Amino acid sequence: MAYGTRYPTLAFHTGGIGESDDGMPPQPFETFCYDSALLQAKIENFNIVPYTSVLPKELFGNIVPVDTCVKSFKHGAVLEVIMAGRGAALSDGTHAIATGIGICWGKDKNGELIGGWAAEYVEFFPTWINDEIAETHAKMWLKKSLQHELDLRSIAKHSEFQFFHNYINIKQKFGFCLTALGFLNFENAEPAKVN
């Protein structure tokens, strides 16, 4: 029996940071720091598969904090995510990393919700920062990116943009910061018909 393409109907937002004085080349921050960031984000026991940025309209109003659904997580399952995540070495002059994800929703000419798009933000800082700086920078760059996504498609904004951010001030040799959307529940579109 044929079935159509799969799309998510429930998502969660999360974030995490990690740092370490140890790591393996060529990207030492990808080893222990990344694992620590996944642990803090509560997604360390998933097999992570990255998504691009298109969100079905069924996710509108169905993006929840990670703590509301963590009890449903299955060890070893595949988790499809949109992730803004990067690592850095203190020796390269990076002392802080900020990450974020923004979401916009578009509407058609009748005002009906079409669906949404996400944008990712990563920025390196030569000094330590605070949450206000991380949030301000994330919103500034994500607003620009989200508006571009709407303008490129000639689609009007349906509702207010949504933003999630995270940051780390690196105190050890290596650091990693991530902000992510994870997708849990799915449905299938109608099977395609070819004329």
From Swiss-Prot:
Domain of life the protein comes from: Bacteria
Subcellular locations according to the entry: Cytoplasm
EC number of the protein: 4.1.1.19
GO cellular component: cytoplasm
Field pH dependence: Optimum pH is 3.4.
Reaction(s) this enzyme catalyzes, per UniProt: L-arginine + H(+) = agmatine + CO2
Regulation of its activity: Inhibited by argininamide.
Record note on cofactor: Binds 1 pyruvoyl group covalently per subunit.
GO biological process, one term: arginine catabolic process
InterPro entries in the cross-refs: Pyr-dep_his/arg-deCO2ase, Pyr-dep_his/arg-deCO2ase_sand, Pyruvoyl-dep_arg_deCO2ase
EC top class named in words: lyase
Obligatory cofactor(s): pyruvate
Keyword Transcription listed: no
Temperature and thermostability: Thermostable. Retains 48% activity at 50 degrees Celsius, and 13% activity at 100 degrees Celsius.
Pyruvic acid (Ser) modification, residue list: S53
Predominant cellular place of this UniProt entry's protein: cytoplasm
Pfam families: PvlArgDC
Site positions per UniProt: Cleavage (non-hydrolytic): T52, S53
One of the record's GO molecular function terms: arginine decarboxylase activity
Keywords: Cytoplasm, Decarboxylase, Lyase, Pyruvate, Virulence
Primary role: Part of the AaxABC system, catalyzes the decarboxylation of L-arginine. The arginine uptake by the bacterium in the macrophage may be a virulence factor against the host innate immune response.
The family this protein is said to belong to: Belongs to the pyruvoyl-dependent arginine decarboxylase family.
Subunit text: Trimer of an alpha-beta dimer.
Protein name: Pyruvoyl-dependent arginine decarboxylase AaxB
